[in-house]
């Protein structure tokens, strides 16, 4: 596989990130504050495929995969406590802590919170897999795959779509220079994923809510020429801050 892949899908990745950020915010507001408003969760389904695609495109554009990994790692570590409290992912291990030793129990609370990882962890794992494939380090790819399978089997990356989500990132990257093949394979993969769920019946077929994630595909595959630019820091800062905002809103309502 060539390192220098030409991105032949939508190159307006900053604009796509902005769309995904807004959709994610609506989704998370719906999950925590308006659980009965199903439409908010439906809107939010477009966010993850877009993040997967922009991650794949970023792996083609970046000058340093190592620096890219470090940014994602730092974002994942910083965002985790905000994710845990913002989206109510406080597990039984965390609740049992008495904080008799504030420092030690705070460290334990933080480590226990990774029983449910934030999306930055999934993006980091996807980026690392793509990096090993790009460099043809297939032994490292295999080791990473086993590690991801372990995390997925224990539910630690389930909230970030688990193994399926990481495979979607790799699929976007592998076919990013072949639009038609990418559309067929990615569309088919996402459709099959939607068939695994329940709750929506169309044309005699039962789908899960992931069916609505396919609404992201036109945004990804139709080229735009807007030249919209957004600082890299916006997404990395917005992610933990919007979770903190949701936490405060939830405590006030």
Question: Where do the protein language model's features map onto the residues?
Answer:
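Alpha-helical transmembrane segments and their immediate juxtamembrane cytosolic regions
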Residues: 1-253
């Amino acid at each position: 596989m060539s390192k220098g892949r030409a991105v032949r899908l939508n190159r307006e990745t900053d604009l796509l990130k902005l769309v995904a950020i807004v959709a994610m915010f609506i989704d998370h507001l719906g999950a925590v504050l308006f659980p009965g408003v199903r439409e908010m969760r439906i809107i939010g389904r477009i966010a993850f495929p877009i993040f997967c695609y922009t991650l794949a495109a970023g792996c083609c554009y970046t000058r340093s995969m190592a620096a890219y990994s470090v940014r994602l790692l730092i974002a994942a570590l910083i965002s985790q406590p905000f994710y845990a409290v913002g989206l109510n992912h406080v597990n039984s291990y965390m609740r049992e802590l008495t904080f008799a030793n504030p420092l030690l129990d705070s460290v334990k609370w933080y480590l226990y919170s990774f029983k449910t990882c934030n999306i930055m962890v999934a993006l980091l794992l996807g980026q690392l897999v793509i990096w090993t494939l790009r460099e043809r380090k297939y032994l490292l790819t295999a080791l990473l795959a086993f590690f991801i399978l372990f995390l997925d089997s224990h539910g630690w990356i389930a909230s970030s779509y688990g193994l399926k989500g990481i495979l979607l990132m790799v699929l976007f990257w592998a076919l990013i220079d072949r639009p038609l093949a990418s559309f067929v394979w990615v569309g088919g993969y996402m459709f099959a994923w939607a068939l695994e769920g329940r709750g929506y019946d169309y044309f005699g077929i039962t789908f899960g809510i992931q069916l609505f994630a396919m609404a992201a595909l036109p945004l990804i595959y139709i080229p735009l020429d807007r030249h919209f630019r957004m600082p890299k820091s916006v997404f990395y800062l917005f992610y933990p801050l919007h979770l903190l905002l949701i936490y405060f809103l939830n405590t006030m309502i």
